[in-house]
Amino acid sequence: MEELTAFVSKSFDQKVKEKKEAITYREVLESGPLRGAKEPGCVEPGRDDRSSPAVRAAGGGGGAGGGGGGGGGGGGGAGGGGAGGGAGGGRSPVRELDMGAAERSREPGSPRLTEVSPELKDRKDDAKGMEDEGQTKIKQRRSRTNFTLEQLNELERLFDETHYPDAFMREELSQRLGLSEARVQVWFQNRRAKCRKQENQLHKGVLIGAASQFEACRVAPYVNVGALRMPFQQDSHCNVTPLSFQVQAQLQLDSAVAHAHHHLHPHLAAHAPYMMFPAPPFGLPLATLAADSASAASVVAAAAAAKTTSKNSSIADLRLKAKKHAAALGL
């Protein structure tokens, strides 16, 4: 017990010495508010959380010394406790302001009210970037160029001369028409695409029309040839024998295939041998052969006339379409 009392008294003596070395409340009042703001050791001893460790130790020692003064050995502690109590008794507004300034200057790592967290900064930067992207997308919208009639005429005239004008021609035309070279280049690209599309449509239309004329010739040898007769031949050849009818059908198919082979698309030449029938057998009467050849000639003539009429009509249709297109363009 005596050892414990000696240890406590020794610790109290050390704390009293530290307190004497610290700045007292009276010295702070005499020195003014500036000294209290500059020196961190001038804070109030009675505060627990916001005071320095040395001052907290001095205040605690004074309180403990005041409580154990009856045990003998805490006289200095009692005096320190009284000083601490007197120091913590009265507070002035100036003192509180000085303590707030000292705390802000003493704790540089504490968060300030003016500082912004990094997450909030990142969010603001992301929102700003999204707004900038939206503005750039709106600005990148292309505006359609409205060409005048004179500009279209000049462009069409140069397109008739060449479909691929060089840079010098485009620059000269752009200066003459008051357009940019990029606009002229884009117009020629669109015009070439439109021209290719029209050519493909016309080519497909001609092929479909020509193939529909000779659709009856594209049959296999085992198909019933009786169904391939022309309507105008049914009444005139009712009294023909079955053998002569077979010969006539063979001649008709041979002539039609030969005509299609020479005038239709070249890729049908490979299929022509499969369309032909074997030659008529020998030993038939000459009158029958002559009648069959005459009927075959009439069939060939009718097919040629139908082809010529269809060709003329297709050319007329193309010319009419060209006139309509020119009228639509305002040429």
UniProtKB/Swiss-Prot annotation:
This is Short stature homeobox protein 2. Residues 58-91 have a biased composition (Gly residues). Keywords: Developmental protein, DNA-binding, Homeobox, Nucleus. It is found in: Nucleus. GO terms for molecular function: DNA-binding transcription repressor activity, RNA polymerase II-specific; sequence-specific DNA binding. Belongs to the paired homeobox family. Bicoid subfamily. The gene is Shox2. InterPro entries: HD, Homeobox_CS, Homeodomain-like_sf, HTH_motif, OAR_dom, Paired_homeobox_Bicoid. PANTHER family: SHORT STATURE HOMEOBOX, SHORT STATURE HOMEOBOX PROTEIN 2. A motif (OAR) lies at residues 313-326. May be a growth regulator and have a role in specifying neural systems involved in processing somatosensory information, as well as in face and body structure formation. May also have a role in heart development. Disulfide bonds: none annotated. Highly expressed in striated muscle followed by liver, kidney, testis, brain, heart, lung and spleen. It comes from Mus musculus. Its main location: nucleus. GO terms for cellular component: nucleus. CDD domains: homeodomain. The lineage of its organism: Eukaryota, Metazoa, Chordata, Craniata, Vertebrata. Residues 1-20, 26-140 are annotated as: Disordered. Residues 93-109, 118-136 have a biased composition (Basic and acidic residues). It comes from the Eukaryota. Residues 140-199 bind DNA. One of its GO terms (biological process) is regulation of heart rate.
